[in-house]
Design a protein with these regions (language model features):
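Structural signature of hydrophobic alpha-helical transmembrane segments
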Residues: 1-14, 51-69, 124-139, 185-196
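Mobile "lid/hinge" segments at catalytic clefts and subdomain interfaces of large enzymes
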Residues: 209, 223-267
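Transmembrane alpha-helix boundary signature
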Residues: 48-61, 73-84, 99-117, 184
Length: 463
């Protein structure tokens, strides 16, 4: 295949990837966006296989079959509630792939057209080093994020003295290693960059709490894009450079949007420690307060006699896998002539769009799902707000308590509703570690129990 034809096909793939991003920006066009992405990837793979430098189609075919089989197995078995962990795992694979490609280019540079072992060009060494650095950080950071999201590692921030100073010194040490590697081209220095970068990736994610996980997932998405971009430079592959830049830039923009939704800077998220000692002290102030409790029958009666209900899903809904029961409850209320809407906070859940994905899986109509800016003005005119596992994003302390770690974070104004029904397992705090003032409001009724079972019991009572 001629170089011109390769360039045209790669450009077509890049355009399809851009269309895919555009399509995925809205639920109604997301299916078409996925199709664009798949077609673009198929064109990219076939074009790459047409290169004269391909030595063994059998090995490549075997890798595609094995990888495709694993991917299909995961896609068929994965539950929608586990998508954040899956995304983090995929990011780790991109990171380690960048490291492997850089290692292959370093040990066999002739195959990549960048020189011979020990005499690689300076620009190629710099590209290789940066790709390795970003890839290793992405790998270890994503693995740790996976553990936090999966629950195998505590989601609480882990902080220690001089943490940020140590991270800064390690970063400077890596820069020094990169300079030494460019000068000496030593395998020992190369693997030192890999190991130290992996350590830095762990240290960067360790102090970040579960409440910040949506931003972390976005940041890791950005890192994986830049890692792929680095691979593109190493391989002199324009499509990888373009695609990596698209993913890196979109992830960075999404991180900014998510941080803005929490009224925090990306830097403050990276520094971590969200929900530390200050949050812990804040929980003790409400220990002597009482809450009003109710049950499924009470909730069914209140909602059945209301004109409007806003449902506010959060991470608790995801954990309980209550989205289908919740949708069934909403359908029954709509049949009774009640106006039902769903309110989504931008950082609800553990990844960007987490609640949107779960509601879409339960076939909740797109037009009923509204974002914070679209729905907040409706709460004062709403008779009932049904909150299901959305803790920090509904906490009025974000507006009233200047000492609170979440102060300044935009929240859903559910407290302005006439009645708030709050479904929760217990009075435990959210990931921020801050007690929710909403629990103690006169217009709030707590519905303690499993979110899915509570919704199912409400459905029975409504029927």
């Amino acid at each position: 295949m001629s170089a011109n034809m390769v360039a045209v096909l790669y450009l077509l793939s890049a355009l399809l990837f851009i269309f895919a991003l555009r399509g995925l920006s809205h639920p109604e066009s997301s299916r078409l966006g996925n199709i664009f992405g798949v077609v673009g990837m198929v064109i990219a793979i076939i074009t790459t296989l047409m290169f004269k430098s391909v030595l063994s189609y059998a090995e490549i075919g075997a890798a595609i079959i094995v990888g495709g089989a694993i991917g299909t197995f995961i896609a068929l078995r994965i539950e929608m509630t586990a998508l954040p962990q899956l995304v983090a795992a995929f990011h780790s694979l991109v990171g380690i792939a960048a490291v492997f490609v850089a290692a292959a280019a370093f040990y066999d540079p002739a195959s990549f057209g960048i020189g011979n072992f020990g005499s690689i060009g300076t620009s190629s060494l710099v590209e290789m080093s940066i790709g390795t650095f970003i890839g290793a950080i992405t790998f270890s950071g994503s693995i740790l994020a996976f553990g936090k999201l999966q629950g195998t590692i505590s989601g609480k921030p882990i902080v220690f003295k001089f943490q940020h100073t140590i991270n800064a010194l390690i970063f400077l040490f890596i820069l020094a290693l990169i300079v030494m590697f460019v000068i000496n081209q030593s395998p020992t220095i190369f693997w030192s960059i890999v190991i130290v970068s992996i350590i830095l990736g762990l240290l960067v994610v360790i102090p970040i709490g579960g409440a910040d996980m949506p931003v972390v997932v976005s940041m890791l998405n950005s890192y994986s894009g830049w890692a792929a971009c680095g691979i593109g430079f190493t391989l002199s592959n324009n499509l990888l450079i373009i695609t990596g830049a698209l993913v890196g830039a979109s992830g960075a923009i999404l991180s900014y949007i998510m941080s803005k939704g929490m009224n925090r800077s990306i830097i403050s998220v990276v520094l971590g420690g969200f929900g530390g000692e200050q949050a812990a002290s804040a929980t003790s102030d409400n220990s002597d307060k009482v809450v009003k409790q109710g049950n499924a029958e009470d909730a069914a009666y209140i909602m059945k006699n209301a004109d409007s209900v806003i449902i506010v899903p959060g991470y608790g809904m995801a954990v309980a896998q209550a989205q289908h029961a919740l949708r069934e409850m909403g359908d029954i209320l709509k049949k009774e002539g009640i106006n039902v809407k769903y309110a989504i906070h931008p950082v609800a859940g553990r990844m960007p769009g987490h609640m949107n994905v779960l509601l879409a899986e339960a076939n909740v109509p797109y037009e009923e799902v509204l974002e914070l800016d679209e729905i907040n003005h409706d709460f004062p005119m709403t008779e009932v707000s049904f909150v299901i596992g959305a803790n920090d994003v509904t906490n009025p302390a974000a507006k009233t308590d200047e000492t609170s770690p979440i102060y300044g974070m935009p929240i859903l104004d559910v407290e302005k509703s006439q009645t708030v029904l709050f479904v929760k397992r217990s009075m435990a705090t959210g990931y921020s570690g801050v007690d929710n003032e909403l629990f103690y409001r006169d217009n709030t009724t707590m519905l303690f129990g499993d979110a899915k079972k509570m919704c199912e019991d409400i459905v029975k009572s409504l029927n």
